Amino acid sequence: MSNLSLLERRIIAAEKLGEHWAELHATWMQLDDAKKNVLAALMNDLDDGEKSEAKLDRLARGSKEYKDYCTNLALAKGAELRAKVKYECARDYFEAGRSAEATARMQMQTLGHIP
C-alpha cells in the first residue's frame, strides 16, 4: 500500500468507512423494520383475551423488553449516524485533495511548466 498515492489512500479509507456505515445502516434498518413486530409479539404475550387492544398496546410499550428494544434501536441509529459522518468526512477529504491536485496542475500549465 506504500506505493499508493495520497489520493488513492484517501479513497481506500473512504471506501472502508462507507462499507462500515452501510453495515451499521443495515443493522439499524432491520431493527427499525421489526419495531411493529416486536410490539405485536409483546402484545400477544400479554393477551389474556380480556384486555382491550389499547390496554395491550400501553402495557407492551411500557414493558422493560420494549424499552430495551427502543434503547437498542436508538443506539444503533447513533452508531449509524456517527459512521456516516466519518464516511462523509473521508469522502470530502478525498475530494479536497483531488481539487487541490487539479488546481496545482492548472497552475503549472498556466506558468508553462507542463508542455
Language-model-derived ranges and their functions:
Residues 1-115:
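Charge-rich amphipathic alpha-helical interaction elements
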